[in-house]
Amino acid sequence: MTKKIFIDGEAGTTGLQIRERLQTLPGVELVSIEPHLRKDPQAKRALMGQVDLVILCLHDDAARESVAMIDELAASSGKPDPRIIDASSAHRVAPDWVFGFPELSAGQEAAVASAQRVSNPGCYATGAIALIRPLIDAGLLPPDTPLSLPSVTGYSGGGRSMIEAYESGSAPAFEVYGLGLKHKHVPEIMHHTGLTRRPLFIPAVGNFRQGMLVQLPLHLDSLPGKPSARDLHDALTKHYQGSAWVTVEAANPEGKLDALALVDTNKLELRVFANDAAKDGFSHAVLIARLDNLGKGASGAAVQNLKLMLGL
């Protein structure tokens, strides 16, 4: 049976990519609202009442408004409300929403599949959580470890205004931002990894449209048990064994990594680069997650979750 899907905010960067990915997916029918009715609550509510699943590609406040609209719809009609995937950050730590990272832990994929409401992870958070959670679960990384997360994304991560600035040539080639140290992805990183100490998250944007690297530097000699690079690699490998989208790769001998290699895919690659046998006695590692910020970091993840929820 064909499932009807409405993308609320389909004209935005993430919405457009989700629409493109769904157009060739068997078993779904995309339902759109006329452009002049996008801000008409009655028209939107009526359309939501006709579909099986709504994907929210909106700013946080607008996403909350749409969820309230769906709640009102269900209360007034007496019919089951449509299922929701929210790509905003509004519900990523909400207790009544399922976090849409199926690889998070055993049972998470089943939780997403049966969920009424799924909150899509943030792009940076996807990489950070993918690196940190397995190490905490394996007992290699205490939850109160002081961590830093220097990361870089393509300019599409900044939305329409940043895209226009870079594509017009008016933006810098590389820029560190978020230096108020209050980035909206930090709460979900802490919540879904079990960290008890706030990590120092340092995002940057480069002059390329899509792609992302999330880095996790570690002083291995300062961690309890002094884990080796092999210990870290094995913990990640065990956690993601059998995953279709998350893979643990060997560190390349060149010691470099291209941020653009996974563009237009839903893949997430994890690597451990290390110097854990240095003559000075200090043991260092940097773990790196590579993904497409608009793929596994946004639209690809939304479609992955949709397919689980609808059994496609």
Give names to the regions the model predicted.
Residues 127, 228-231, 298:
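Short amphipathic alpha-helical segments
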Residues 140-141, 195, 312:
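Helix N-cap/coil-helix junction residues
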Residues 269, 276-312:
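NAD(P)-dependent Rossmann-like dehydrogenase/reductase catalytic/cofactor-binding core
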Residues 1-172, 177-179, 271-279:
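N-terminal Rossmann-like NAD(P) cofactor-binding subdomain of oxidoreductases
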Residues 13-45, 57, 145-146, 150-151, ...:
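C-terminal substrate-binding/catalytic lobe of Rossmann-fold NAD(P)-dependent oxidoreductases
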Residues 134-138, 219, 305-309:
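Active-site catalytic microenvironments for nucleophilic, acid-base chemistry
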Residues 118, 235, 302:
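PAPS/PAP-binding and catalytic site of the sulfotransferase fold
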